[in-house]
């Protein structure tokens, strides 16, 4: 059979004819052939989402295409780059049971390669937590010990913990770094008691340089596990080993947490992560799009960022959903398509976020005024009056301050905005024609 790279390139040429251009560009173009073993062709996808999408939507089509090219029935398997090492020919172990031995740090699969300081987007809601995490990574057990990070789901706590682990290992390859969830700690502890291996369990977690333990709130109510973790904490702290803990709430709010554990969690630094603001959400989307090789218009990223303000996971998930929807219906990505793609996951009760630009555009459409005229020095009634209406609506429909509104209207003073608001408010009480025009503008903005 021909070289697998040549075979796959031939298959791609055929697949390009069978699927839409957006589908090919999004899902197939960036794939490569990894290997061919025992009638199984392994294809490398650029990321996890693409791998899953290819498996569920294109496996059959790819198999048929390869059959047409080779006359052989090949099974298709998709992998992502970091899992390729698992597919290589197994080498003899350097010593018996090497696979079961504890290594100096966790396997690559345990520390997510995507979760580094370089890929973390810094914003007002996580700036302090990021700085504290970096300080801990640069000087384990010398800056803040323990470091306790808390915040809601999907805000970046786990990302920072993995980033600390990666940084420590990169700068000290011999460091013993362990990351695990409190649930895993609990399960291993229970199993160690059952199997009479308590000593092995203690040695495993009390002889590390950095312990990263996620979701510590799950220890609540587990008295024996809390007892074990208390002694593990003490053993590490006394040896000046770094401990990093995450939770969905601060120590004082974790129910049924022993006071002695709570006090130890408060020995070091407690920092929180809050939901990202609009600017940070846009930056997160841009970084995600760049990482996935996606070309997303700015208006679409702004729309998604305005609609999804809960956490980073949902934000990135919304972006991928829009890309997938675009591919399925074979249409270019724009704000309207994004709205259609996300209609099922955006609560109906969530009000539309209206910007001053939106208001200027709507008023301009109704009164035939160019956008640039709202910021110009023109004082003719045909421009000045619509400008006052736009200022009035900006005050009513946005959270912008008076100076901010004035700035968006050519740098006018805030007193000008106040005057416009008072004037239009007064006219609306008696002028029925103006009432209808403002109602029309509101309809456009809905």
UniProtKB/Swiss-Prot annotation:
Residues 1-92 are annotated as: Domain I, interacts with DnaA modulators. It is found in: Cytoplasm. This is Chromosomal replication initiator protein DnaA. GO terms for molecular function: ATP binding; ATP hydrolysis activity; DNA replication origin binding; lipid binding. The gene is dnaA. Residues 93-109 are annotated as: Domain II. The keyword Membrane does not apply. It comes from the Bacteria. Pfam families: Bac_DnaA, Bac_DnaA_C, DnaA_N. Plays an essential role in the initiation and regulation of chromosomal replication. ATP-DnaA binds to the origin of replication (oriC) to initiate formation of the DNA replication initiation complex once per cell cycle. Binds the DnaA box (a 9 base pair repeat at the origin) and separates the double-stranded (ds)DNA. Forms a right-handed helical filament on oriC DNA; dsDNA binds to the exterior of the filament while single-stranded (ss)DNA is stabiized in the filament's interior. It comes from Bacillus cereus (strain 03BB102). ATP binds at residues 154, 156-158. Keywords: ATP-binding, Cytoplasm, DNA replication, DNA-binding, Lipid-binding, Nucleotide-binding. Oligomerizes as a right-handed, spiral filament on DNA at oriC. Domain I is involved in oligomerization and binding regulators, domain II is flexibile and of varying length in different bacteria, domain III forms the AAA+ region, while domain IV binds dsDNA. Belongs to the DnaA family. SMART domains: AAA, Bac_DnaA_C. Disulfide bonds: none annotated. Residues 110-326 are annotated as: Domain III, AAA+ region. The keyword Oxidoreductase does not apply. Residues 327-446 are annotated as: Domain IV, binds dsDNA. Its main location: cytoplasm. GO terms for cellular component: cytoplasm; plasma membrane. One of its GO terms (biological process) is regulation of DNA replication.
